[in-house]
Every structure is written in C-alpha cells, then in structure tokens.
Amino acid sequence: MIPYQEWHSQLQLLYDSQIFHNWALCQDVHLNDEKDGLLLRLIPTRQLQKNTERIENKLLSHIELYLTYSKVYNEPLLLLRIWEEKSIDGIPMTKLMLPTDIESLLDVQGKFQLGLDTIINLEGSVWYSFHPCDTSCIVGDQAEFMSTYLRRWVSIFIFSWLGYEDS
C-alpha cells in the first residue's frame, strides 16, 4: 500500500528521472497532472508482435500504458491498450485491439490478473487493467522501503514483461 501523497510525489520523481524517456521502446511520455497519471506510448516488442501475428493474425501499431492510482486499493494501477495497424482501401489506420486472451498475447499468464474495464476519469475509454489486489505482497510495503515503492512497482509491473533497454 502506498498513500496517495507519497504516490503523487514518487510519480513526479519517476517522470523526472527520465527512465521512460530513455527507454528504447518508449515513443512518448506524458505526465498528466489533471488526471494524476503518466501516459506512455510504446513500440511493441518483437515477441509481442510475433504473439499477435500468431494468436490474433494482426499487426501491431503501438501500445499505450497509463500509470494511475487506485483509491480503492491505495496502490498504483497499470492500464493498457493495444493498437493494431490496418489498411482499408489502401488507407493506413490504427484501431483499438481487444484480444480475447490478453494474458497469452502479453505472455504474462499466471503472473498478473488482467481485466477489461471502462475507465470513467479517462473519458469512459476501454482499457485492460492489471488488477492491484496483490500489489503490496508482490512489491513489498515495508516502511523502510517506501521511498522506492513506485520504482519497484514499475520494474515488476512493466519492465518484467516488456524488458528495459536504454535507447
């Protein structure tokens, strides 16, 4: 568990650290003070692209991750959207992709619990969410390590399945 004020200050520190700006997969980083979250636009990994072609027979355009705070669980909450590349009558476009087996596609079966949600404070848009119910057990919430809670959370909930490589 991380108190909201601590989350807010650690989110700013995380953004300022440039960890996402320097990530090879990251195309764009946007800190949203109004909605109290961090939006990332990512290039799909080769493995994710291969899984998508094999499972869904589709080509990926990009991935969106949104880091926000769950006031119900008092934990960070990771939201995810996957966009596919399409061509209709020769006109390229991107379309939101809603795979039926998201865990297999992301190769996170048994590691995280994902669900499809409508997020009201994000214009009622549809996102997959990594359920935060076991977060404190996974990340560890001892008081002496609270100052690094969000960094540890990011390494587990994002970098563990997407990998991290400097650009």
From Swiss-Prot:
Gene3D superfamilies: 3.30.1460.50. GO terms for molecular function: Atg12 transferase activity. Its EC number is 2.3.2.-. The keyword Membrane applies. Signal peptide: none annotated. Keywords: Autophagy, Membrane, Protein transport, Transferase, Transport, Ubl conjugation pathway. It is a peripheral membrane protein. The active site is at residue 133. InterPro entries: Atg10, Atg3/Atg10. It is found in: Preautophagosomal structure membrane. GO terms for biological process: autophagy; protein transport. Its main location: membrane. GO terms for cellular component: phagophore assembly site membrane. It is an enzyme of class 2 (transferase). Pfam families: Autophagy_act_C. Belongs to the ATG10 family. E2-like enzyme required for the cytoplasm to vacuole transport (Cvt), autophagy and nucleophagy. Acts as an E2-like enzyme that catalyzes the conjugation of ATG12 to ATG5. ATG12 conjugation to ATG5 is required for proper localization of ATG8 to the preautophagosomal structure (PAS). Likely serves as an ATG5-recognition molecule. Forms homooligomers. Interacts with ATG7 and ATG12. This is Ubiquitin-like-conjugating enzyme ATG10. The gene is ATG10.
